[in-house]
Amino acid sequence: MRNIIHPSLNEIPVHQVLRALGSPVRLAVVKALLDGKVHQGSDFDFGVSQSTLNHHVKILREAGIVQNDPDGTRCLMSLRAAELDERFPGFIEQLRVLSAAE
């Protein structure tokens, strides 16, 4: 499996993070990862094909929102919650509040 590059959050402007969350599928992925656990894409059903989900996860990774880690033939993902909260204080808590309100 190829080496996956994760950007430093210091390099990511807030508009890129917000733009990445502009898709209902990507927002659903982030909400699912708010549990703080490591998941693989097959853990969830977002109503899209695997290739489409991979595309959405790539956008989230490039925006610094998720961490992808290869594990054999799987690719595990988790939310970069601590880093996001350090860069954008209160951001994760607001996502949790908004997620609970829906």
List the predicted regions and their residue ranges.
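A short, conserved structural fragment
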Residues: 62-71
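N-terminal helix-turn-helix DNA-binding core of bacterial DNA-binding proteins
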Residues: 15-49, 71-83
